[in-house]
Amino acid sequence: LNESTIAKAPFALGYRATIYLGHWALHYESAETAPNWEYQKINTNFHDNRGSNTPYRMHYVQEMQKVVQGGLTAKVPAAKDVQKMMLLKAAEKTKLPLSFETIVGAGTKNERVYDLPPARIGYLYAYASAVNEKGKVTYGEVYLVLKGNKKSLVIKNVTSQGIGAWIPIQ
């Protein structure tokens, strides 16, 4: 759909064109990647064992579906492109399955057992984990320059900006 071709002209004397393609996010350089194992609380299981004389075996069960959102910590141009670059770099560094949106479904269970002693109240908290990614994104204005039979990309007005993101672990 958006494909363009430029054919060579045999006599392209005096032929010159500069086409502005846009202001793009060109590069992302990671400075720090750190996991946060308690990024967002997603569930609480509760049991009151005060009236019992026997221990209660407590399991984790997700009570409601929970959507965990990540995102950039600042507004930047071309945010979707920056998110993709940061996601790729963070996944490469951590070797974890990352996504800017993670869903924990209702009824999700874990087989691990927690014994609740008699005459006690028990709370079991569940948290979604996330990775905090910080770095620097580079922007530039991209031009297609045609001069005679020569074609080239030229990048002008290059700027850098610090950026951070929270990326939930799936």
Where in the sequence are the language-model features?
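Proline-rich intrinsically disordered, low-complexity coils
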Residues: 10, 35, 77, 97, ...
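Weak global preference for isoleucine
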Residues: 6, 19, 42, 103, ...
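Short, surface-exposed interaction patches in beta-rich subdomains
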Residues: 129-130, 143
